[in-house]
């Protein structure tokens, strides 16, 4: 008897399951009752190894400096944090067994448990102490190491911003840096740095020692952080990369070579990094020295490099050679119609802390930043023409109202795609104010509704055409839109996006020419987004902590800041790339964020202020919202519902608490596991 099911039947059930999971996960991420391990979890199968392919090479394994999805795997699994979350999103003890808050001194005190560092052989090196957190934070605040998440420290830890800026300016002085605008840096014999900007009085910066930074090892098992203000999201921030510990003597010995290999990485988490060979293999093993080793059920995690993982992975699943693979939309139908594979397909656990949006490149030319150079768009994509077009608000609004996100989301979620659609950057149920009002119902965000409107899009297009023509823009405007070939179905999303948006905006006039380009599979962010080699790009952002300020990180830049942000909006204004009413909109957003950050004693007012700023960012089409992360269709032997969960940070990447089963999970089992957690 043929018991195959149709794709529509499967997807309808799975989309409802995923949508329910999203809602449940988002809500529990903001509160809920504590729970032990998920009930109904199957026991381990014949082995406790977990093998998966990967096809995108991480640029680094240094968890103190990275911020990308793939590269934080080691930090998430091999290094424990002060606090962690259970599988329902409830915070619990981690390396700290207790903590206290002193509002008068703005100081958190953490009391640490006994724990050890182990090397790549699993041998004990030294105990974990409070000083390891201090040394790690000093490493993050060292400009030479260019930590991508340094802003998560300088914004909240007392003295950190002054320390970092002084040493950044000192480095500039010692290396003879001259900024694009002519700003110079000099240092005298006493270490005082003078910064001289054109048309400004020189500013002097006295030496700042690390002792001035608000992190202290009171003794081996007592750690304190002194904050710049009573920041409500600080505890949730601790379950993220820049607040992880690192063994101080190893940092001192290895410097910028820290965590570039298994030999230069020490672990104190559920697993230790046993082997790492670039473009070959990546092995983590269970750490028997970990305090919670009894709740680690996987002995060996092996990641094997395969450039064609999306093709070879499913075939290796059929042969039982690996434990997980993504089932792309191009083969999903055949898998669901085949009795031998239909019960091997389920879904990943929804990653509710990630949202997706489109960014415009406001700086399409080569540009020098404080710690790297941006090449900009290639000449064939006409960056000069794009630079003129992107400064036109009506042009950008034609995109905002012309994009039908349902079409693009349907590539990965053929049924239930509207469950993932967003008209904001922040997802629903991320946090609520003191009265329990969802953040998306606060301030001006409460007025944002569906943007897609073909008639409005054409109105904005028609208004833009004479303005752009007067500015010297030629049509059609080339829109370079890259994708990462290692990301399943991203290429297909780009194709339907091009067809849909061109169908709207090119109706009656040759307005735009969306040119889809394949970026490199390895180091895509460094090669494309951070290198300015795009005009319009799908980006994502994962919340780092439970406060709306985290959703500003891709967009906000402090005055004069030259650090890494997705769009370099303020830099674009300061350096003359962004002009006119677009520049006004950018600066109004920056000022609104600066005012919102100052509100620390009234949560309702704080959330309203951030909501107003986010609404202005969107309504001025400085960014175009897309949707929430859609869980992939996968074949897996892991019950991810047993694992840690949080709506912020990297908890969802941790494999502690998860069993390897003796079979691939079906969709019905996936739903049962979800309901039993």
PLM feature spans:
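Gly/Pro-rich hinge or "lid" segments in bacterial periplasmic/extracellular proteins
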Residues: 180-183, 187-212, 220-221, 226-302, ...
């Amino acid at each position: 008897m043929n018991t195959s099911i149709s794709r529509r039947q499967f997807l309808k059930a799975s989309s409802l399951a995923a949508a329910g999971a999203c809602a449940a996960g988002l809500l529990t991420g903001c509160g809920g009752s504590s729970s032990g391990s998920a009930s109904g979890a199957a026991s381990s199968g014949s082995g406790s190894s977990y093998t998966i392919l990967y096809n995108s090479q991480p640029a680094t394994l240094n968890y103190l400096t990275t911020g990308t999805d793939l590269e934080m795997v080691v930090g998430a699994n091999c290094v424990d944090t002060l606090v962690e979350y259970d599988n329902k999103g409830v915070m619990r003890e981690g390396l700290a067994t207790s903590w206290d808050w002193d509002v008068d001194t703005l100081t958190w005190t953490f009391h640490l448990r006994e724990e050890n560092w182990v090397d790549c052989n699993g041998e004990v090196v030294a105990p974990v102490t409070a000083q390891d957190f201090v040394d790690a934070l000093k490493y993050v605040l060292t400009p030479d190491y260019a930590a991508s998440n340094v802003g998560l420290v300088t914004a909240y830890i007392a003295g950190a911003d002054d320390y970092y800026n002084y040493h950044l300016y000192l480095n500039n002085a010692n290396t003879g840096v001259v900024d694009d605008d002519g700003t110079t840096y000099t240092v005298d014999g006493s270490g005082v740095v003078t910064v001289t900007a054109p048309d400004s009085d020189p500013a002097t910066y006295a030496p700042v020692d690390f002792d001035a930074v608000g992190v202290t090892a009171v003794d081996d098992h007592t750690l304190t952080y002194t904050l710049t203000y009573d920041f409500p999201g600080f505890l949730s921030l601790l379950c993220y990369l820049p607040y992880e510990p690192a063994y101080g003597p190893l940092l001192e010995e290895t410097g910028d070579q820290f965590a570039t290999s298994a030999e230069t990485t020490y672990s104190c988490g559920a697993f230790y990094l046993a082997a790492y060979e670039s473009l070959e293999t990546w092995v983590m093993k269970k750490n028997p020295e970990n305090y919670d080793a009894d709740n680690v059920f996987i002995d060996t995690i092996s990641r094997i490099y395969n450039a064609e993982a999306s093709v070879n992975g499913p075939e290796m699943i059929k042969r039982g050679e690996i434990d997980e693979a993504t089932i792309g939309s191009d083969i999903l139908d055949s898998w669901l119609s085949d009795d031998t594979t239909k019960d091997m397909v389920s879904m990943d656990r929804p990653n509710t802390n990630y949202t997706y949006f489109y960014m415009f490149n406001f700086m399409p030319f080569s540009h020098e930043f404080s710690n790297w150079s941006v090449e900009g768009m290639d000449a064939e994509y006409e960056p000069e023409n794009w630079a003129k077009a992107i400064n036109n608000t009506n042009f950008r609004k034609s995109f905002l109202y012309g994009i039908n996100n349902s079409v693009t989301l349907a590539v990965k979620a053929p049924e239930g795609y509207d469950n993932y659609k967003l008209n904001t950057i922040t997802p629903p149920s991320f946090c609520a104010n003191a009265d329990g009002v969802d953040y998306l119902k606060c301030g001006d965000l409460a007025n944002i509704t569906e943007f897609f409107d073909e008639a409005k899009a054409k109105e904005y297009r028609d208004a833009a055409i004479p303005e752009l023509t007067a500015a010297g823009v030629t049509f059609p405007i080339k829109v370079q839109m890259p994708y990462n070939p290692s990301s399943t179905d991203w290429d297909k999303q780009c194709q339907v996006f091009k067809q849909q948006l061109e169908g709207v905006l090119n109706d009656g006039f040759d307005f735009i020419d969306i040119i889809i380009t394949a970026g490199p599979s390895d180091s895509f962010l460094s090669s494309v987004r951070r290198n300015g080699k795009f005009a319009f790009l799908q980006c994502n952002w994962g919340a780092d902590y439970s406060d709306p300020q985290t959703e500003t990180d891709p967009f906000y830049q402090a005055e004069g800041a030259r650090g890494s942000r997705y769009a370099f909006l303020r830099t674009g204004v300061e350096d003359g790339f962004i002009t006119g009413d677009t520049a006004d909109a950018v600066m109004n957003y920056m000022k609104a964020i600066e005012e919102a950050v100052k509100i620390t004693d009234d949560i309702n007012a704080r959330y309203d202020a951030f909501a107003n700023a986010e609404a202005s960012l969107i309504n001025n089409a400085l960014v175009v919202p897309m949707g929430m992360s859609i869980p992939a269709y996968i074949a897996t032997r892991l019950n991810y519902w047993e694992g840690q969960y949080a709506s912020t940070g990297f908890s969802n990447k941790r494999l502690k608490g998860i069993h390897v089963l003796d079979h691939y999970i079906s969709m019905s089992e996936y739903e049962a596991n979800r309901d039993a957690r």
